[in-house]
Every structure is written in C-alpha cells, then in structure tokens.
C-alpha cells in the first residue's frame, strides 16, 4: 500500500523528528549547565558568570523553539500519514471519501498561542545571545574572547 518513495519520505521525516527531539534535549542541557554553572562532564569552557547566564538563557529559549518545532513536525508527520492512507484507501477501493489536508489543522486559539510563544522566545533568544556575546567580549577585552581565554588551544 505504501509506495517506496512515500515510505522513504515518511521514514526520513520520522528520523528528523527524532533528531530534533534530541537537539531540544541537548539545548536544554546546555542551557541548564550554563545557567547553574554545573558542568559534570567538563564540556563547557570556563567563562564569567554574567556571560554564561545570558548565553544559558539564550540556549533555554532555543530549546523551547526546538521543542515547538519538533512538536509541529510530529503533528505534520501524523497528519501526512492520515492524508496518505486516506488517499491510498480511496484509490484502492474506488471510494469517494473527501481527502484530508496534508498540514495539521490547529485551532485559532492554539495557533495564536504558539505564534506568540515562538515570537517571544525568538526575540528573547536573540537579545540574550547578543548581550551575552557583548558581555563576554567586554570582559575579555577583545571581540574574539575565545582566543583570549584559549578555548580551542
């Protein structure tokens, strides 16, 4: 019932959703490490706390954006499967059931809430990242603060 091309596309989209979920968790872990100052695996380089706090807040906002993107991609995958199986069933049995939309149909209130959360998180992420970069550059005395602190040496 599934064509090979459709199966490959659906599998690729499912892998994308899984990877995006993993990225959401990674951004969350990075944000928490930067905000709290805890670094159990010693992966985050040393930096002043003010810059670390601002970059951590930026990473937490990015995690929220990634969670919302993952959720929407999961809804899209689910709706795409429903629409494809409806279409295939109509073709197989010569049925006249109406086709389903390919995109997820969210209610107006849900769309507004998600859009507002995305816009606020995106603005907060941008402002906190630029502020964190500026704080780190000023505390190092150079725009390339990672060179001053020998992060990659």
PLM regions: where:
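Cytosolic juxtamembrane amphipathic/interface segments immediately preceding
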Residues: 5, 100-114
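Hydrophobic alpha-helical transmembrane segments of integral membrane proteins
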Residues: 1-85, 115-143
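Juxtamembrane inter-helical linkers in multi-pass membrane proteins
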Residues: 79-106
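Membrane-proximal, acidic/low-complexity disordered segments on the non-cytosolic side
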Residues: 145-153
């Amino acid at each position: 019932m599934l064509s090979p091309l459709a199966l490959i596309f659906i599998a690729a989209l499912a892998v994308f959703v899984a990877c995006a979920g993993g990225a959401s968790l990674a951004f969350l872990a990075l944000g928490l490490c930067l905000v709290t100052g805890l670094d159990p695996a010693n992966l985050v380089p040393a930096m002043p706390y003010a810059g670390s706090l601002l970059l951590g807040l930026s990473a937490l906002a990015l995690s929220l954006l990634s969670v919302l993107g993952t959720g929407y991609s999961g809804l899209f995958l689910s709706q795409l499967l429903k629409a494809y199986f409806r279409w295939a069933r109509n073709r197989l049995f010569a049925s006249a059931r109406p086709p389903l939309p390919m995109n997820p149909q969210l209610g107006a209130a849900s769309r507004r809430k998600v859009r507002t959360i995305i816009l606020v998180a995106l603005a907060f992420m941008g402002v906190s990242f630029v502020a964190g970069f500026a704080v780190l550059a000023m505390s190092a005395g150079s725009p390339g603060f990672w060179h001053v602190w020998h992060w990659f040496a």
